[in-house]
Swiss-Prot record:
One of its GO terms (molecular function) is tRNA binding. It comes from Rhizobium etli (strain CIAT 652). GO terms for cellular component: cytosol; small ribosomal subunit. GO terms for biological process: translation. The keyword Isomerase does not apply. It comes from the Bacteria. PANTHER family: 30S RIBOSOMAL PROTEIN S13/40S RIBOSOMAL PROTEIN S18, SMALL RIBOSOMAL SUBUNIT PROTEIN US13M. This is Small ribosomal subunit protein uS13.
Length: 122
């Protein structure tokens, strides 16, 4: 199993698909990386040489922010919004939808399971 950016990549899958197992690399970026390095798209991970794995690793380290760094930056951006006290930060702090969705009904994923309220029986 090849290890790229701290993630064990599945060996039986095509390289483009396997790279999407890394947080921060989706299908588009995976295709770009494979084209930059010059690996055929049909090649499977177990068919890669050590030199090709090293090239992929270097291309990712050089051009993309992935895994821990990306998670840390995302968390810092959310923390910054919360510290500013702006509307988006308040929504994050309260655990409500941030992007304008309705909350009267729905939004259960963000708000958590429904809470019973005393005196609401019919």
């Amino acid at each position: 199993m090849a290890r790229i950016a701290g993630v064990n990549i599945p060996t039986a899958k095509r390289v483009v698909i396997a790279l999407t197992y890394i947080h921060g690399i989706g299908p588009k970026f995976a295709q770009e990386i494979v084209e930059k390095v010059g690996i055929p798209a049909e090649r499977r991970v177990h068919q890669l040489t050590d030199a090709e794995v090293l090239q992929i690793r270097e291309a990712i380290d050089r051009d993309y922010q992935v895994e821990g760094d990306l998670r840390r930056e995302t968390a810092m951006n959310i923390k910054r919004l919360m510290d500013l006290g702006c509307y988006r930060g308040l929504r994050h702090r309260r655990g409500l939808p941030v992007r304008g969705q309705r909350t009267h009904t729905n939004a259960r994923t963000r708000k958590g399971p429904a809470k019973a309220i005393a005196g609401k029986k019919k």
